[in-house]
């Protein structure tokens, strides 16, 4: 059977909050079967636990933000993307600030952290959400859609009129039946424009942003000395974000995701639209491994995992 997964041992790291610029300590702990992924603000007078759920996402202007009882945990999408890519179902995430550390701006540090803790299967069936009919949300020319598909694949189109982005691919598709998340997606860094960073800093945000944790572009070129990690790193990062945004639904999705210029807000609207239509999805488990989509098979786990 396809089993749930958690990590074998506690693991901890320290990083910088993208917006606060402050030091953040992140601790990942094993969680029992059927726990899900639970974020806890351990710095508050009374710790607040926030289980991931589509309905728990509040602010989505700059990142995906979990909210509960006035407590917030921001910028969860890169860690959630790593959890999805490695097939982690159950995890306690303790953080002593209101945002997850940005690390290098990709999911690679979180993949390394989870792998260094060790990943173990649990004696419980992994539950999937299978998309049964197409669900779509739009905002102007922005679009996000989920379609029935026996596996997990994504296609994303961006539209940034910028010389450095134009030289790379603006559309990227990936099917995890035959492609590795760790190799092809995890290392893609977040990116932004210098004038936007300055505007955010004037608002007291992006204080931790730097060339060490983002690709930064001026009007004509990339300011980083380091070359792109992928020829089309910009759109691959949007795929990375989408994987993390979708995983807050609480289970891996069996389906196809298609997006044009989507972002955290539209991705969350898509999940809510899916869950609002009981005919659009079903919960499934697989007693026999060979009945499951190839993307989620144990031998493929170094692939989508």
From Swiss-Prot:
Molecular function terms, GO-annotated: metal ion binding; UDP-3-O-acyl-N-acetylglucosamine deacetylase activity
Amino-acid positions noted as binding Zn(2+) in the UniProt annotation, renumbered to this chain: 78, 237, 241
Gene: lpxC
Biological or metabolic pathway of the protein: Glycolipid biosynthesis; lipid IV(A) biosynthesis; lipid IV(A) from (3R)-3-hydroxytetradecanoyl-[acyl-carrier-protein] and UDP-N-acetyl-alpha-D-glucosamine: step 2/6
Cellular component aspect of the GO annotation: membrane
Active site positions, chain numbering: 264
InterPro entries according to UniProt: Ribosomal_Su5_D2-typ_SF, UDP-acyl_GlcNac_deAcase, UDP-acyl_GlcNac_deAcase_C, UDP-acyl_N-AcGlcN_deAcase_N
Similarity field: Belongs to the LpxC family.
GO biological process terms, semicolon-separated: lipid A biosynthetic process
Annotated PANTHER family: UDP-3-O-ACYL-N-ACETYLGLUCOSAMINE DEACETYLASE 1, MITOCHONDRIAL-RELATED
Lipid metabolism listed as a keyword: yes
Name of this chain's protein: UDP-3-O-acyl-N-acetylglucosamine deacetylase
